[in-house]
């Protein structure tokens, strides 16, 4: 089954077929994971190939995916990279959504704590435009806060709303990166 994050789920594999299925996946040079309390596959809009795309969305998303995919966290964690204002809603629906800055060309703005599902919540905009090379540091910092303060089954947004001082810590850290 294909998932909304561009991964596949193998359903109905019996225990006796599990090892050969894993070997087949590895032989095809595909990776295992994408479920449980981990950072999920980083999603991207079609921005690289879109006439409104403002940067190479796919290359940036791939770099972030290589660094963060599969990291253990208290509950699932979703990162998305989007290329223009048309994807603002998608950026706000991620644990971390990354978009180009519309006030400082060549920089990026981040939305944190978005949720979908039966209780959707818009991610909060962190109003500190960051250079591309600082975005991974910002994500790493947020993940560290989540891993340090969260416990299963809390999502990032719950952790941040329960300990409001963490929002301020994130803002201070982002400002230090932007200097």
Regions inferred by a protein language model and the residue ranges of each:
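Mobile "lid/hinge" segments at catalytic clefts and subdomain interfaces of large enzymes
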Residues: 83, 87, 92-155, 169
């Amino acid at each position: 089954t294909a998932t909304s994050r561009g991964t596949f789920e193998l359903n109905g594999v019996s225990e006796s077929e599990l090892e050969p299925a894993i070997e087949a996946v590895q032989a095809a040079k595909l990776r295992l994971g994408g479920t449980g309390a981990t950072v999920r596959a980083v999603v991207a809009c079609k921005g690289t190939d879109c006439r409104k795309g403002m940067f190479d969305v796919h290359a940036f998303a791939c770099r972030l995916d290589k660094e963060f995919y599969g990291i253990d966290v208290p509950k699932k964690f979703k990162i998305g990279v989007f290329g223009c204002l048309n994807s603002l809603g998608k950026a706000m629906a991620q644990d971390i959504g990354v978009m180009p800055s519309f006030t400082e060309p060549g920089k990026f703005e981040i939305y944190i704590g978005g949720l979908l599902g039966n209780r959707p919540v818009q991610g909060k905009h962190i109003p500190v435009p960051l250079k591309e090379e600082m975005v991974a540091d910002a994500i790493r910092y947020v993940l560290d806060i989540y891993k340090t303060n969260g416990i299963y089954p809390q999502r990032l947004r719950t952790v941040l709303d329960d300990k409001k001082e963490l929002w301020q810590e994130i803002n201070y850290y982002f400002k230090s990166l932007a200097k």
